Swiss-Prot record:
Pathway(s) it belongs to: Purine metabolism; 7-cyano-7-deazaguanine biosynthesis
UniProt key word RNA-binding: no
One Pfam family here: QueC
Cofactor: Zn(2+)
Protein's UniProt name: 7-cyano-7-deazaguanine synthase
Gene, per the UniProt record: queC
Species whose genome carries this gene: Coxiella burnetii (strain RSA 331 / Henzerling II)
Molecular-function GO term, any one: zinc ion binding
Record's cofactor remark: Binds 1 zinc ion per subunit.
Organism placement in taxonomy: Bacteria, Pseudomonadati, Pseudomonadota, Gammaproteobacteria, Legionellales
NCBIfam families noted in UniProt: 7-cyano-7-deazaguanine synthase QueC (TIGR00364)
Any one biological process term the GO annotation gives: queuosine biosynthetic process
EC number assigned by the record: 6.3.4.20
Catalytic reactions on record: 7-carboxy-7-deazaguanine + NH4(+) + ATP = 7-cyano-7-deazaguanine + ADP + phosphate + H2O + H(+)
Role played: Catalyzes the ATP-dependent conversion of 7-carboxy-7-deazaguanine (CDG) to 7-cyano-7-deazaguanine (preQ(0)).
Length: 226
């Protein structure tokens, strides 16, 4: 059976991405990262989601990039803001995060002799992160072609971003059609230890908007009523 490495954070998009990989018939290897994120409950969700989808293996790699600061998701001196709705790159951007994650995924995929890596990046209804754009995915594909033994031998590992052109509502509809239980997911940047959401950060607002537009009941549990 063909193999794939799927990046899973415990959130809505990456869980949908895992469901897509399963629907394509991949033997799934899930990869998560403990990078010093404040919303650590997403990793608890990732463990449950990986087990739910019966992945072959789930690895959680510990990184120390949070020690470098520079993002409200990792730096205790920076507060995660409420939803701003502007087009500038927000303070929740973690510098080079997807490049670091995909590089490790690329190494594992080559070790496994996997043919694909799937990432839940989306350029629609997103927070404006530069490493979630189609041109970024294309650039990393070029890197994968050049930087691996498989690539040099003409069997390059494919970098797939199946949600890249989908709105949040379209992503939710897709996942719903594949049987995803979104109550298992944690998207909030300020989620507490139980995985309850704040309801006001960028991620929460985009998630609420997605369920509303998809006309699907939002199963998200909030710290306080929003």
């Amino acid at each position: 059976m063909k193999k794939a490495v799927i990046l899973i954070s415990g959130g809505l998009d990456s869980t949908t991405c895992l469901a897509v990989a399963k629907s394509k018939g991949f033997s799934c290897y899930a990869l998560s990262f403990d990078y010093g994120q404040k919303h650590h409950s997403e990793l608890v969700a990732a463990e449950k989601i990986a087990a739910h989808f019966n992945v072959v293996r789930h690895e959680v790699v510990t990184l120390s990039i949070g020690k470098l600061g520079g993002s409200a998701l990792t730096d205790n001196s920076l507060d995660v803001p409420d939803y701003g709705g502007n087009e500038s790159i927000p303070i929740t951007y973690v510098p080079a995060r997807n490049t670091i994650f995909l590089s490790i995924a690329l190494g594992w995929a080559e070790i496994l002799d996997a043919e694909s890596i799937l990432i839940g990046a989306s350029a629609i209804d997103y927070s404006g992160y530069p490493d979630c754009r189609p041109e970024y995915i294309a650039a990393f594909q070029n890197l994968a072609n050049l930087a691996t033994k498989r690539g040099i031998e003409g069997h390059s590992i494919k970098i797939e971003a199946p949600l890249i052109h989908l709105s949040k509502a379209e992503t939710i509809k897709l996942g719903y059609s594949l049987g995803v239980d979104y109550s298992m997911t944690v998207s909030c940047y300020r989620a507490n230890e139980e995985g309850l959401a704040c309801g006001y950060c960028d991620s929460c607002e985009l998630r609420k908007k997605g369920f509303k537009e998809a006309e699907i009941k939002d199963p998200t549990q909030y710290i306080t009523k929003v």
